[in-house]
Amino acid sequence: HLCDRRQRQMCIRDRYLAYAEAANEAWGPKGDNGNGYSAYDVIKAIRKRAGIGGTSDPYLEQCAGDRDKMANLIRNERRLELCFEGFRFWDIRRWKENLNEPVRGIDWDRDGHSFNEFVVEERNYEDYMYYCPIPNSEILKFSNLVQNRGWK
């Protein structure tokens, strides 16, 4: 069934990227702890599948020796590979990135050669919003459960 196959493909990309992120955090860009695949290996395969870095991938090679650079590359790969699939909302919170970054858009001129950038939305998040509220129905079920700080 086509839909099932598409869902598996979407899921496997997330799993590969999650593994790359975890492997980089645990063992660095080229460490694999005996698993056979490092963060570097996984990202190289993902980029190769996308047609990036056929014979060489200078950006990947530049990041291969630095955990922080590799983490940034992996985050960017997640942004690109999983766009419009609902992961970005959770990734930004998990990484504790700035939630108040303005949402920007572009407006192409009629000639198609230039564009103007504009702010679509200004955001006003507070620190407690990194965590979602616990549904009240769950709090009512479990008397020892306390609502996340900042939520009522």
Task: Annotate each predicted stretch with a short phrase.
Residues 1-4, 8, 12:
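Single conserved hydrophobic/aromatic residue that forms the stacking wall/gate
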Residues 58-70:
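Short, mixed-charge amphipathic alpha-helical segments
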Residues 28, 32-58, 85-152:
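Aromatic-residue-lined binding/catalytic grooves and analogous aromatic/hydrophobic interfacial grooves
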Residues 80-84:
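Conserved small-residue hinge/capping positions at short loops/turns
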